[in-house]
């Protein structure tokens, strides 16, 4: 089965024709924190570009920061005094936290760093800079010249939606007052380069379209941008792709005003966190950022989450127990890719998903420390990172001979597992080793079984987890002790709970003398 990104890439080539270079675009308004839902737009453009590159084409991936949009409302996490900046470009609103040159830069810079950590190369462009240096001047003038046609297109869709037509004094652009920097209404155009405006403060004047103070309205700005950069593909959320929305009007405006065809698009669905209700909003502050995911996920897994889901399918990221399954799934796909494990089903699609979720694929399988087991080991106070690596090698989870890349990856996973246990793990997964044996009633046959296990461990200089597991089952079976009674007693003895991690692996990870003493109720 063909991966969805390859399917889209093939469709772009068919519909846009053979080119030496294709342009893919994504874009976001930095009105608040750029969250994992926003990232889906950039990643969808990126992965389709990746597929085009793999077919031998040059690709330019533009990510447009719409930082020349108005500051529309004061978010909850911003001081109410910021209402005085409403109507100004977000790129000119001061940073409330005082660490960046502007409100917009505060959010853009963080997201750009997060994207870089994923190894994704993208060309970030800033609408404020493009407008201010006059790069769009010719296209803005064309929009003024085609005002009547644009109104006709927009009114056609407004009528279908049973909305009133645009007023006769509507213009396809707005002005930022050079004096107050607030949005001003246009009241006249001289037919050339000058526009007359009136700002909310009552100030009137003329500005030159080439001065950078005139900005196209969204439904005109978007198709103008497609034409200016010759965009071949840009994904969009379903609000932009609904019937009569900005994509529909944009398709007609780009053709009527700029004489070009609209790029191909693809609708992407919502991204949320399992268990959280409602839609994330960067301006409301109820968001999960890429940097939040980096606290518990390797970069490859973040990319994998988005690569394996078709864009029209909703993603619910499970940061609870489902995260352990995600690591298991990713590790399995990675092993299949490197031929270490056989696969059932469509092997090629699995391999392609792995390829597309990695900008730079290693030349061999880097050691995979099982995250599920790491979540146990990081809770053992006697084990530091080196101790954990020793347990992993002794129990055969990773090779005994480790290279630098292997050790780096294992150490990263150890840190991620610690973070997961602290922040997201349910109580059923958490435990602590009891410093002293608890005072619990233990049946005589269970005591005998405990002593037999203690003697067996004492007699061995080394042993495998499987050997210990067999002993644990045998000593209970020959005494007629039920598995439930036997295992719950041992868990209570070590962690004070009736359930816990896989017992043999757990006991084998503890200090041998400590296990023997505890089984004898000595300490």
From Swiss-Prot:
Annotated keywords: Aminoacyl-tRNA synthetase, ATP-binding, Cytoplasm, Ligase, Metal-binding, Nucleotide-binding, Protein biosynthesis, Zinc
InterPro entries the record matches: aa-tRNA-synth_I_cd-bd, aa-tRNA-synth_I_codon-bd_sub2, aa-tRNA-synth_I_CS, aa_tRNA-synth_I_cd-bd_sf, Lys-tRNA-ligase, Lys-tRNA-ligase_SC_fold, Rossmann-like_a/b/a_fold
Principal subcellular localisation of the protein: cytoplasm
Catalysed reaction, written as an equation: tRNA(Lys) + L-lysine + ATP = L-lysyl-tRNA(Lys) + AMP + diphosphate
EC assignment: 6.1.1.6
Binding residues for Zn(2+) 2: 177, 180, 199, 203
Residue interval(s) of motif 'HIGH' region: 30-38
UniProt-listed SUPFAM superfamilies: An anticodon-binding domain of class I aminoacyl-tRNA synthetases, Nucleotidylyl transferase
Entry-linked Gene3D superfamilies: 1.10.10.350, 1.10.10.770, HUPs (3.40.50.620), Lysine tRNA ligase, stem contact fold domain (6.10.20.10)
Cofactor(s) required for function per UniProt: Zn(2+)
Binding site for Zn(2+) 1: 95, 99-100, 106
Superkingdom to which the source organism belongs: Archaea
GO biological process: lysyl-tRNA aminoacylation
GO terms assigned for molecular function: ATP binding; lysine-tRNA ligase activity; metal ion binding; tRNA binding
Cell location: Cytoplasm
Name of a matching Pfam family: Anticodon_2
A GO cellular-component term linked to this record: cytoplasm
Motif ('KMSKS' region): 279-283
Cofactor note: Binds 2 Zn(2+) ions per subunit.
NCBIfam families hit by this protein: lysS_arch
HAMAP family membership: Lys_tRNA_synth_class1 (MF_00177)
Family of the protein in this entry: Belongs to the class-I aminoacyl-tRNA synthetase family.
Name of protein: Lysine--tRNA ligase
Origin species: Pyrococcus abyssi (strain GE5 / Orsay)
């Amino acid at each position: 089965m063909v991966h969805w990104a390859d399917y889209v890439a093939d469709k772009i080539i068919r519909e846009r024709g053979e080119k030496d270079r294709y342009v893919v675009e994504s874009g976001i308004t930095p009105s608040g924190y750029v969250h994992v839902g926003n990232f889906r737009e950039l990643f969808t453009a990126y992965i389709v570009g990746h597929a085009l590159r793999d077919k031998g084409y040059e690709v330019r991936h533009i990510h447009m920061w719409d930082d020349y949009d108005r500051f529309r409302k004061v978010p909850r996490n911003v001081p109410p005094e910021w209402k005085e900046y409403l109507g100004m470009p977000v790129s000119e609103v001061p940073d409330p936290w005082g660490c960046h040159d502007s409100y917009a830069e505060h959010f853009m810079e963080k997201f750009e760093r997060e994207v870089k950590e994923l190894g994704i190369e993208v060309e970030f462009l800033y609408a404020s800079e493009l407008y201010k240096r006059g790069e769009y001047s010719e296209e803005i003038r064309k929009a003024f010249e085609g005002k009547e046609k644009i109104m006709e297109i927009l009114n056609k869709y407004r009528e279908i939606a049973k909305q009133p037509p645009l007023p006769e004094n509507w213009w396809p652009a707005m002005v930022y007052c050079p004096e107050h920097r607030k949005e001003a209404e246009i009241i006249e155009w001289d037919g050339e380069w000058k526009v007359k405006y009136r700002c909310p403060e009552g100030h009137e004047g003329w500005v030159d379209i080439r001065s950078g103070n005139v900005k196209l309205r969204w439904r005109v700005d978007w198709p103008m941008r497609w034409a200016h950069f010759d965009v071949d593909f840009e994904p969009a959320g379903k609000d932009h792709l609904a019937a009569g929305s900005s994509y529909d009007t944009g398709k007609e405006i780009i053709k009527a005003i700029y004489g070009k065809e609209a790029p191909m698009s693809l609708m992407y669905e919502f991204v949320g966190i399992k268990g959280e209700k409602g839609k994330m909003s960067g301006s409301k502050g109820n968001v999960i950022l890429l940097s939040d995911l980096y606290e518990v996920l390797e970069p490859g897994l973040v990319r994998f989450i988005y690569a394996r889901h078709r864009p029209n399918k909703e993603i619910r990221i499970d940061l609870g127990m489902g995260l352990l399954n995600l690591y298991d799934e990713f590790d399995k796909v990675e092993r299949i890719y490197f031929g270490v494990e056989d696969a059932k089903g469509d092997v090629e699609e699995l391999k392609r998903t792995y390829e597309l979720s990695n900008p730079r694929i290693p030349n061999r399988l880097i050691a995979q420390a099982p995250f599920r087991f790491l979540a146990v080991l990081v809770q053992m106070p006697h084990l530091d990172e080196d101790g954990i690596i020793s347990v992993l090698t002794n129990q055969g989870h990773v090779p005994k001979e480790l290279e630098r890349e292997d050790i780096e990856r294992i150490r990263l996973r150890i840190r991620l597992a610690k973070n997961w246990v602290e922040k997201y793990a349910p109580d059923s997964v958490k435990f602590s080793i009891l410093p002293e044996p608890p005072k619990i009633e233990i049946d005589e046959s269970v005591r005998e079984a405990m002593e037999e296990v203690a003697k067996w461990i004492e007699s061995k200089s080394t042993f495998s987890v499987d050997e210990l597991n067999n002993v644990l089952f045998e000593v209970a079976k020959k005494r007629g002790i039920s598995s439930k009674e036997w295992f719950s007693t041992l868990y209570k003895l070590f962690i004070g709970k009736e359930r816990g991690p896989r017992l043999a692996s757990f006991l084998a990870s503890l200090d041998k003398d400590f296990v023997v003493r505890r089984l004898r109720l000595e300490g």
